């Protein structure tokens, strides 16, 4: 990303806020460090809700799609061969920290234990990039949101194959958990 390029997502004029949108928007708009773990069934709009909350709040947004293969190099940075030279490239976590942006760890329950490198980041501290001997502190406004189809406990019913049980210490780094709104309490009027 170009350091001067805005990473604020575009507002979708067709988006209709629902569920916990106002809660997510409040977290994003506050500019405070408040990691939130957002759970819900696949396809119910978790990621889009967070993106649109960032658009409304005019907050920069970095999305990282997590897989079982995601590791420290993918998240924090790595060396890459560019024009015949080996060059360090910051990962999306470092870029979001330095810009004071909102970082979305999408589908975090697909991750392996390789994401434990994020522990200091989730504690609100900086992170040491040992490969380049550099410490990165989070800029004002940086925060982390994570989405998951499960609550980090895996999928016993087989609906979400590939999801993993997340380390309890890792889950505890998210002071806010946003769960799907239950509509079972709604009563619909009957037509007579």
Where are these regions (language model features)?
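A short, hydrophobic C-terminal helix/tail in secreted or cell-surface proteins
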Residues: 187-192
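AAA+ P-loop NTPase catalytic core and its hallmark functional loops
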Residues: 2-186
């Amino acid at each position: 990303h170009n350091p001067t390029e805005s990473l604020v997502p575009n507002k979708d004029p067709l988006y209709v806020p629902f569920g916990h949108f106002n809660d997510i928007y409040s977290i994003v708009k506050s500019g405070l460090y408040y990691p939130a773990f957002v759970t819900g069934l696949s396809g119910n709009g978790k990621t889009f809700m967070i993106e649109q909350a960032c658009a409304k709040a005019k907050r920069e947004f970095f999305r990282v799609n997590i897989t079982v293969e995601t590791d420290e190099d993918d998240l924090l940075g790595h060396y890459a061969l560019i024009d015949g030279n080996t060059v360090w490239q910051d990962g999306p976590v470092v870029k979001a920290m330095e810009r004071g942006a909102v970082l979305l760890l999408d589908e975090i329950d697909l991750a392996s234990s390789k994401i434990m490198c994020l522990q200091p980041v989730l504690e609100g501290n900086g992170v040491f990039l040992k490969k380049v001997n550099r410490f990165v502190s989070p800029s004002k406004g940086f925060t982390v949101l994570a989405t998951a189809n499960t609550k980090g406990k895996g999928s016993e019913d087989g609906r979400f194959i590939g999801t993993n049980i997340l380390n309890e210490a890792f889950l505890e780094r998210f002071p806010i958990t946003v769960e799907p709104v239950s509509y079972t309490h709604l009563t619909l009027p009957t037509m007579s």
